[in-house]
């Protein structure tokens, strides 16, 4: 089933394949999974918080908080989905939760401030409440989008703010009267002051006018003298510049004449120098031609001999390299053969050791299995005989042929001797009951000496159901 949430909603999915919860805008809801939808739009909560200042003065703080999930933080959305989304945003549960946090933080903060501080620092008080409430709401994934704190209101029976307002009004009225009186006083004083200042300023202006007129006349004379002086200086400068220009012109004419003569001499010398250079170039080319000819004659023979020697040396070097490579290859082959032989020997020994280890393990496992089987067998036998250890021991000795083995050993020991043999009989040799019972009597005749011999050699007594030895024999 494919589900899509609206623009202001989220899907909360739980169930198979999801470790905790999953938030999504759209998703497939698989069998074994469940989902719910929660809205992200904020909600307005209006409260009238009753608090008490540090002077134990109660007051009412009307406030409107706009609170909703923090949409820009995935961790906060997960907290909101787990803790708040199962409840309706407008339900009493959510409202009581938010109201409890706001009232608690407001009362704690108000208790640390005086009424005057709360009244005059409403903005700071609001910021403190906002910060502390937001800190508590973070653990539920909620964010305060807006918080409006209205004017503080008196609790019925406590008219602090009304008295404070009356006080402010009276202070304002008194201040207004004082301001009116001060304004009248300032008006009268100002009028007289203005008249005096007018007379003073008129006299001052007359004096300053005379001074300025004399200053202007002196400045005019100084300016005339200054202008005449500057004109004379300018004339002298112009005459000096004309003389300097004439001198420079004469110098330049002399330099130009000298340069022309030098150029003529340099031209003549350059022609002679170029002639000598060309003649030297001709001689050098002749010498190079002769040198190249001699090189061609003598170096050709030397080059041939050099190439021959180089080829012979290269051949000797190549032969020695090949011989060295052959010896190296032979040594490598021998080393690889020895290594292969060592690897084969090591592998054979490893396989033999592993086979022996496997045989020992299997033998040990067989012994363990046999021991377990014998334990089960003895346990079953002991249970069948009513946990009679003596009966189990005798059964095992009889079943294992121990008595026969003991008799055989005793017979071997007394072979060739004349042992004393006791024979018990019932004294009825000539009675008419001979026949089948005779064989049974013979068996019973054999048992007493066998039991006695076993007792003498091992100290073990026969079971009660097979007979009892006389006391004299035991002693």
Curated annotation (Swiss-Prot):
Its subcellular locations are: Membrane, Caveola; Cell membrane
Q: What is its main location?
A: membrane
Q: In which tissues is it expressed?
A: Expressed in roots and nodules. Primarily expressed in vascular tissues. Upon induction of nodulation, expansion of expression in the root cortex in the region of elongating root hairs, which will eventually become colonized by bacteria. Expressed in the infection zone in nodules.
GO cellular component, alphabetical, reads: apical plasma membrane; caveola; plasma membrane
UniProt keyword list: Cell membrane, Coiled coil, Membrane, Nodulation
Give yes or no: UniProt keyword Transmembrane helix. Answer: no
Task: Give a single Pfam family match.
Answer: Band_7
Q: What induces it, per record?
A: Up-regulated during the first 7 days of nodulation.
InterPro entries, A to Z: Band_7 (IPR001107), Band_7/SPFH_dom_sf (IPR036013), Flotillin_fam (IPR027705)
Q: Does the entry feature the keyword Transferase, yes or no?
A: no
| Coiled coil residues, start to end | 235-255, 305-325
**A biological process from GO:** nodulation
In the record, the note on similarity to other proteins reads:
Belongs to the band 7/mec-2 family. Flotillin subfamily.
- What role does this protein play? May act as a scaffolding protein within caveolar membranes, functionally participating in formation of caveolae or caveolae-like vesicles. Required for normal infection threads initiation and elongation and nodulation. Probably involved in polar growth of the infection thread.
Q: What else is known?
A: The predicted palmitoylation site present in all other flotillin-like proteins is not conserved.
> This protein is called what?
Flotillin-like protein 4
Q: Source gene?
A: FLOT4
């Amino acid at each position: 089933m494919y589900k899509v949430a609206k623009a202001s909603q989220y899907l909360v999915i739980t169930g198979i394949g999801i470790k905790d919860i999953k938030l999504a805008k759209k998703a497939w809801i698989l069998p074994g999974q469940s989902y719910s939808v929660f809205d992200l739009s904020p909600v307005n909560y209006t409260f009238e918080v009753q608090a008490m200042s540090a002077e134990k003065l109660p007051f009412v703080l009307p406030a409107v908080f706009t609170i909703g999930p923090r949409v820009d933080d995935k961790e906060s959305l997960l907290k909101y989905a787990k803790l708040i989304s199962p409840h309706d945003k407008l339900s009493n549960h959510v409202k009581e939760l938010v109201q409890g946090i706001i009232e608690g933080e407001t009362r704690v903060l108000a208790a640390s401030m005086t009424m005057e501080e709360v009244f005059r620092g409403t903005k700071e008080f609001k910021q403190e409440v906002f910060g502390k409430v937001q800190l508590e709401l973070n653990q539920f994934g909620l964010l305060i989008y807006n918080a409006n704190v209205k004017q503080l209101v008196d609790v019925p029976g406590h008219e602090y703010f009304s008295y404070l307002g009356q006080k402010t009004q009276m202070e304002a009225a008194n201040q207004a009267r004082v301001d009116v009186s001060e304004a009248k006083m300032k008006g009268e004083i100002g009028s007289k002051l203005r008249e005096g200042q007018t007379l003073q300023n008129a006299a001052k202006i007359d004096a300053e006018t005379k001074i300025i007129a004399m200053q202007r006349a002196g400045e005019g004379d100084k300016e005339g003298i200054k202008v005449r002086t500057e004109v004379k200086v300018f004339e002298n400068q112009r005459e000096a510049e004309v003389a300097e220009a004439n001198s420079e012109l004469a110098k330049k004419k002399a330099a130009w004449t000298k340069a022309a003569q030098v150029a003529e001499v340099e031209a003549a010398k350059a022609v002679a120098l170029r002639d000598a250079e060309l003649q030297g170039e001709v001689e050098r080319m002749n010498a190079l031609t002769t040198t190249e000819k001699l090189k061609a004659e003598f170096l050709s023979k030397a080059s041939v001999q050099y190439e021959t020697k180089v080829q012979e040396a290269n051949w000797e070097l190549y032969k020695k390299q090949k011989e060295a490579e052959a010896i190296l290859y032979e040594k490598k082959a021998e080393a690889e053969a020895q290594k292969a032989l060592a690897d084969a020997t090591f592998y054979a020994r490893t396989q033999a050791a592993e086979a022996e280890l496997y045989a020992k393990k299997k033998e040990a496992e067989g012994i363990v299995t046999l021991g377990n089987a014998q334990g089960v067998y003895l346990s079953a036998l002991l249970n069948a005989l009513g946990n009679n250890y003596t009966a189990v021991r005798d059964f095992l000795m009889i079943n294992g042929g121990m008595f026969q083995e003991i008799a055989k050993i005793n017979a071997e020991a007394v072979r060739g001797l004349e042992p004393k043999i006791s024979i018990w009989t019932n004294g009825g040799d000539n009675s008419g009951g001979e026949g089948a019972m005779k064989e049974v009597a013979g068996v019973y005749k054999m048992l007493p000496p066998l039991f006695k011999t076993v007792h003498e050699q091992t100290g073990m007594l026969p079971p009660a159901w097979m007979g009892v030895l006389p006391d004299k024999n035991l002693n």
